Amino acid sequence: MNGLNALNMRQEPKRGAKLAEKLKCEKSSIHYLSILNGNTRGLVWTDDPTAPRLAVVYSYLLGGFQIMGTPLQTAEEYAAFRLFFENKVFPLAKDEFELSEFAYSADTEALSDMMRVVFFDKELFEQKQLVYRTAEEYSAAEMPFIHAAEGRPMRIRRASESFLRENAEFAGAYLPEILESYKSFADFLKHGFAFFVLEGENICGNIISNGEYNGCCIVGADTKAEYRRRGIASALLRTAIEFARERGNEIIWECAEENIPSVRTAESCGMHRCGEFFVRWFEFEPNTPQD
């Protein structure tokens, strides 16, 4: 293989278990494996749909990219890969997805080193992410106490068709986020789950799964600012752990190393740290006005 034809990255519309199996490694992100598997929405480019050596995976939910596979070998391949980003990925990211920066992670250190060479002229920023997993020795524990205001009890409710009909805030504020990862709400209920803490009908906090692969579910949680420091996130995470365990699944929790409350939430629910990775990004240069 010579010249720019040494690497022909193309969009891969047909995703499935075989593609995920061929590209995964020990440190692969569950969220991006779920995209490769076809359970979660995203875009995939590979160098070869039948025997992929390299893949670039885009997440609609995260607005970021994952680099998977094995590193490039030749200068021609590096040049072709950079042109692939310049000619295909960057215009799509800026014009269609309206992104102001290009953010990515890589499955391995070798791929991270490769990307530094590919973007040798970019000013890269980075943030360390920690990965937590349900501990094997985890056992059901008493549900953490939620510190509700006097006379304003809180309850936890699972997302369902009836919840969608009954709670306008869920339908208006949270359903759109879910549909960034799943093609329909029915598809979400088939492959994912969500729990919400309610004060009356007001949603105080949530935990939503955004990918599943090989029995592992990755979740993201958020608590409204005025309800923080009340044990809501821990209660939601423990609820998700119990829900997953009943179905023979495990929970994956990712957070920035500097996000101490999120780290403490994972540890308070008996999760153990099983890995780490870096998110790196650079800002797009503003478009030059055309005469």
Cite the ranges covered by each PLM segment.
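Short amphipathic alpha-helix that is part of the acyltransferase structural core
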Residues: 1-28, 134-183
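Terminal substrate-recognition subdomain of acyl/acetyltransferases
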Residues: 133-144, 268, 272, 276-291
